[in-house]
C-alpha cells in the first residue's frame, strides 16, 4: 500500500507540474495579429561602430524602457545621428517628434528610432511599404504585403498619428486637449496593452525581436550622443 501511495503521489506531482508549466494563450490584440513585418528589413548598421552595441540593460532595461516619459536626446543629436546615413533627412521631423512627444507624454526620441526602422533612415527605399509622399513614418495601416498604408497631409500630421498609435497602446486616457484624432487605427488597439517598447513585439509588428530592435537602435543613439558631447 505504501508503495502504491508513493507512486500515486509522484504521478500526481508530475501532473500538476506539467499544468503549471503549460503555455497559456496570450490575449488577442485586434491591431497586432496581422502577418506583416516592419516595412524596412535591411540591417541598420552603423558605418563606424563595429562592436559598439550597448547592452539593453545599460540604457533601456526591458522592464523600465517605457513608452511614456520625457525625451532625453535633443533634436541636434538625433539629426547628426541620422545624417550619417541620410544627409537629406529634414531636421523638422526630429523637432516635431520631440515637441509632440512632450504633448502626449511619449518618448519622442525613442519613437523616432522606431520610425528609422520603419522607413530605413527616412530614405523610404529598399523594401519600405510606405513612400515619402505619404508622411507615414511607422508603417501605419500596412497590415500585409502589398497594402500601401495610411497617408497624411503634412509631416506634423504623420508624426502625430504615429504618436497617437503609441499612445493607444501605452495609455488608457483620452487624447490631450485640442489634439485631433488622426490615427485611423486608434480604435482597433486594446488600450493600455503595451507599456514598454518591448511590449510592441508581436503586436505592432509580427516580429518577436521588434522591441529589441528599437531598444538597440536607441542605445546606439545614446552612445553616439554621449560621444559627441
Model-identified regions with their sequence ranges:
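Catalytic cores of secreted/periplasmic lytic hydrolases that degrade extracellular macromolecules
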Residues: 2-6, 18-229
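Bacterial N-terminal signal peptides
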Residues: 8-16
Amino acid at each position: 500500500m505504501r508503495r502504491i501511495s508513493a507512486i500515486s503521489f509522484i504521478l500526481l506531482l508530475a501532473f500538476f507540474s506539467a499544468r503549471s508549466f503549460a503555455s497559456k494563450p496570450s490575449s488577442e490584440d485586434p491591431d497586432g495579429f496581422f502577418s506583416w513585418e516592419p516595412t524596412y528589413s535591411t540591417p541598420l548598421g552603423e558605418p563606424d561602430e563595429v562592436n559598439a552595441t550597448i547592452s539593453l540593460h545599460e540604457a533601456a532595461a526591458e522592464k523600465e524602457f517605457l513608452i511614456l516619459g520625457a525625451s532625453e536626446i535633443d533634436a541636434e543629436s538625433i539629426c547628426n545621428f541620422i545624417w550619417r546615413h541620410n544627409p537629406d533627412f529634414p531636421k523638422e521631423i526630429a523637432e516635431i517628434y520631440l515637441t509632440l512627444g512632450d504633448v502626449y507624454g511619449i518618448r519622442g526620441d525613442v519613437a523616432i528610432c522606431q520610425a528609422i526602422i520603419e522607413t530605413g533612415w527616412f530614405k523610404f527605399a529598399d523594401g519600405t511599404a510606405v513612400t515619402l509622399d505619404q508622411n507615414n513614418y511607422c508603417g501605419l495601416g500596412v497590415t500585409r504585403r502589398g497594402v500601401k498604408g495610411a497617408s497624411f497631409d503634412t509631416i506634423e500630421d504623420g508624426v502625430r498619428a504615429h504618436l497617437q498609435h503609441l499612445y493607444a497602446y501605452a495609455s488608457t486616457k483620452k487624447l490631450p486637449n485640442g489634439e485631433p484624432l488622426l490615427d485611423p487605427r486608434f480604435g482597433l488597439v486594446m488600450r493600455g496593452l503595451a507599456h514598454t517598447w518591448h511590449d510592441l513585439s508581436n503586436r505592432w509588428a509580427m516580429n518577436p525581436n521588434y522591441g529589441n530592435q528599437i531598444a538597440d537602435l536607441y542605445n546606439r543613439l545614446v552612445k553616439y550622443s554621449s560621444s559627441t558631447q
